[in-house]
């Protein structure tokens, strides 16, 4: 059985998230998803939704076999516990694949690191960004300052 890990924030689920998870699931037989804890999201605005709610929504998606919230201090701890064959990175995620491979090797994990394919918008007003969804909600409600 080929175990695949996908990871991310998964705040305000959109078609890009679904595509990423479908692509990741196609890389193996069992898809594990690790959701970044709110306090660990430092490269963008923190998630709007709580950790458990984001996990529960992701767990309900068809391609996902298991979903868990990441470790508060060591982002590789859940990966060690899962012992995957593949880590699937989102096509636009900021992660350095070579650095991940080096850390996996240092921890004795034999795991491939692959990038998911991009998902292009299928129609003019399709929104493929959680931040863009939040901005659109605020703009349509006339409140640009949360």
From Swiss-Prot:
GO molecular function per UniProt: ATP binding; FMN adenylyltransferase activity
Sequence positions that bind ATP: 9-10, 14-17, 92
Gene Ontology biological process terms, A to Z: FAD biosynthetic process; FMN metabolic process
Cofactor(s) in the UniProt record: a divalent metal cation
Domain of life where this protein originates: Archaea
Known catalytic reactions: FMN + ATP + H(+) = FAD + diphosphate
Record keywords, A-Z: ATP-binding, FAD, Flavoprotein, FMN, Nucleotide-binding, Nucleotidyltransferase, Transferase
Disulphide-bridged cysteine pairs: none
Annotated pathway: Cofactor biosynthesis; FAD biosynthesis; FAD from FMN: step 1/1
E.C. designation(s): 2.7.7.2
Its biological purpose: Catalyzes the transfer of the AMP portion of ATP to flavin mononucleotide (FMN) to produce flavin adenine dinucleotide (FAD) coenzyme.
Family, similarity comment: Belongs to the archaeal FAD synthase family.
Assembly: Homodimer.
NCBIfam families linked to this entry: cyt_tran_rel
The protein, known as: FAD synthase
Organism field: Halobacterium salinarum (strain ATCC 700922 / JCM 11081 / NRC-1) (Halobacterium halobium)
Gene (name only): ribL
């Amino acid at each position: 059985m080929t175990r695949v890990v996908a990871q991310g924030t998964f705040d305000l689920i959109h078609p890009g998230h679904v595509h990423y998870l479908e692509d990741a699931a196609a890389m193996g037989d069992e898809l594990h998803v690790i959701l970044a804890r709110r306090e660990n999201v430092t490269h963008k605005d923190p998630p709007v939704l709580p950790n458990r709610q984001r996990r529960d929504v992701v767990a309900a998606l068809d391609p996902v076999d298991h979903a868990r919230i990441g470790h508060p201090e060591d982002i590789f701890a859940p990966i060690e516990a899962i012992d995957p064959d593949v880590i699937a990175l989102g096509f636009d995620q900021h992660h350095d694949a070579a650095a991940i491979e080096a850390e996996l090797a240092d921890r004795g994990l034999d795991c491939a690191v692959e990038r998911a394919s991009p998902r292009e918008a299928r129609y003019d007003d399709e929104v493929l960004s959680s931040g863009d969804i939040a901005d659109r909600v605020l703009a349509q409600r006339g409140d640009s300052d949360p």
